[in-house]
């Protein structure tokens, strides 16, 4: 698995180092971190973790020993000094480069999947990458015409109709087309990724009590229910 560092000024390097310090994840996969080699070195040292940070080059994905943390650093030059916890174009550009490299490795078949540490949305926009999040950026890099964000936890598999928008803007963004698309993508994902032959997809309401016949909003009757019925008919 390729694990992108996320924003070097953020929590990503620490989360990655702590996660890979244990044996549980290494029993499940062969991890390789795609990010800044000096930042990972400094992070491991500051946390007093008993791991050797090693650099791997190019498309090399040989599994490291249990006490090694393998890092593929695609940066042309070290990041140098930067403020922690602050959005800057410098670290924003680096985090985007890490994602692009991970996509390249996945498309070449060098890694089987990508795990992403947090990016800073403000920082990537400061760097000229005008995407609201990982989902939209990954769709663009892979030329994927239809995409959606699904979160998985235990028995729950939740597909979003909208992503990365302010709550106040949400009602105006809900359309029958978008809802039908989310239902269709959820159905396909449950079949193809989770092996569920006959998935059951539930559609959540927007308003309290599903609008209570218009007392608390009409999006359910006007948009959500027609989209649900259209999807059922397909």
Q: Where are the regions that the model predicts?
A:
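Conserved beta-strand scaffold positions in the cores of enzyme catalytic domains, especially
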Residues: 70-71, 114, 147-149, 158
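Short, flexible loop segments at boundaries between secondary-structure elements
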Residues: 140-156
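Contiguous, glycine/small-aliphatic-enriched amphipathic segments in soluble metabolic enzymes
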Residues: 1-134, 177-234
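Ligand-binding beta-strand-loop-alpha-helix segment within the catalytic cores
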Residues: 151-181
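Structural signal for conserved beta-strand scaffold positions within catalytic alpha/beta enzyme cores
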Residues: 55, 73, 149-152, 160
């Amino acid at each position: 698995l390729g694990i992108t560092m996320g924003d070097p000024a953020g929590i990503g390097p620490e989360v990655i180092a702590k996660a890979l310090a244990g044996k549980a994840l290494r029993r499940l996969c062969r991890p390789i971190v795609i990010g800044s080699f000096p930042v990972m070195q400094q992070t491991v040292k500051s946390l007093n973790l008993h791991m050797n940070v090693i650099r791997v080059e190019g498309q090399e994905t040989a599994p490291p020993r249990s006490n090694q943390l393998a890092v593929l650093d695609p940066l042309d030059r070290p990041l140098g000094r930067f403020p922690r916890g602050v959005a800057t174009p410098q670290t924003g550009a680096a985090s985007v480069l890490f994602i692009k490299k991970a996509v390249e490795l996945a498309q070449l078949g060098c890694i089987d999947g990508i795990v992403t540490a947090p990016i800073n949305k403000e920082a990537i926009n400061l760097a000229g990458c005008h995407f609201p999040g990982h989902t939209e950026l990954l769709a663009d890099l892979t030329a994927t015409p239809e995409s959606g964000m699904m979160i998985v936890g235990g028995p729950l598999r939740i597909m979003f109709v909208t992503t990365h928008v302010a709550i106040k803007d949400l009602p105006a963004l809900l359309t029958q087309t978008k809802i039908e698309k989310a239902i269709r993508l959820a159905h396909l994902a449950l079949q193809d990724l989770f092996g569920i032959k006959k998935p059951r997809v539930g559609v959540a309401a927007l308003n309290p009590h599903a609008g209570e016949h218009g007392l608390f909003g009409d999006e359910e009757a006007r948009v959500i229910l027609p989209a649900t019925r259209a999807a059922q008919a397909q």
